Each structure stands twice: as structure tokens, then as C-alpha cells.
Design a protein with these regions (language model features):
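Contiguous, often N-terminal, cationic amphipathic patches that form binding interfaces
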Residues: 1-64, 74-77, 81-85, 94-126
Length: 126
């Protein structure tokens, strides 16, 4: 479980990350199973990173969606300390996610996080 201070809760926060990932400063990258959106903001400098999950009904029924959220939450809770302060991350599950071994998801998540954080960091200077 992610601590409350590390969770995105408001829909406006989710929208800002998803919008920001397409614009200046933000970044997104995806695999067959997940898409990771990152939006570092100066307004949140010095505050802990926050994470949000988006798992739509296209992924499966409620049982499947909740399991997907539990797995993604557990993977992110062990990686939250690696994220820089002031960064908001949204992980969007794709329809191929159910049934994917956790080890593969962990590998994809690590690779995608490294990619989007590197891109977001290089765009901040511009």
C-alpha cells in the first residue's frame, strides 16, 4: 500500500499529469502492458513524489482490475524511494496486463520509469 502522501487522489491531479506528459516538462513511455506518465513540477519542489493508477474497464471485470491495481501498487511502493521529489507519476494499465507475470511487469516498470525520468529531466533544462 502506498502511504497517503505518495498518492494522487484528485482527478485534476491526474489530468495535470496526463496533460503534462504530452507537453513541456513531462514525459510518457509505454510497453505492451503499461504506460507510464511523469510530470515534474516546480510547484511541488521538495514535496514527496506521488503515484496514481488508471485501470479502465477494458482491462477486465472488477476482480481483474483490482488485482492489477494491487500488483502495480506493490511494485510502485518498493520503487517510490527512487523517484525524485516533486514528481507525479501515473501508471495506465493496458488491456494485455491481466495474467502477466509480476517479474515481467517489474522489468517493464523499471525500464519505463528510467526512460520517462531521463526524458523529463532533460526537458526541464530547456
Amino acid at each position: 500500500m502506498l502511504p497517503a502522501r505518495h498518492r494522487l487522489r484528485r482527478s485534476s491531479d491526474f489530468a495535470a499529469v496526463l496533460r503534462g506528459a504530452r507537453g513541456a516538462g513531462g514525459s510518457r513511455s509505454g510497453s505492451r502492458f503499461i504506460v507510464v506518465h511523469v510530470n515534474p513540477t516546480d510547484a511541488r519542489a521538495g514535496q514527496p513524489p506521488r503515484v496514481g493508477l488508471v485501470v479502465s474497464k477494458a482491462v477486465g471485470n472488477a476482480v481483474v482490475r483490482n488485482r492489477a491495481k494491487r500488483v502495480l501498487r506493490a511494485l510502485m511502493s518498493s520503487r517510490i524511494s527512487q523517484l525524485p521529489d516533486g514528481v507525479d507519476v501515473v501508471i495506465r494499465a493496458k488491456t494485455d496486463l491481466p495474467g502477466t507475470p509480476t517479474a515481467i511487469l517489474a522489468h517493464d516498470l523499471d525500464k519505463l520509469l528510467a526512460t520517462v525520468l531521463r526524458r523529463a529531466g532533460s526537458q526541464e533544462g530547456h
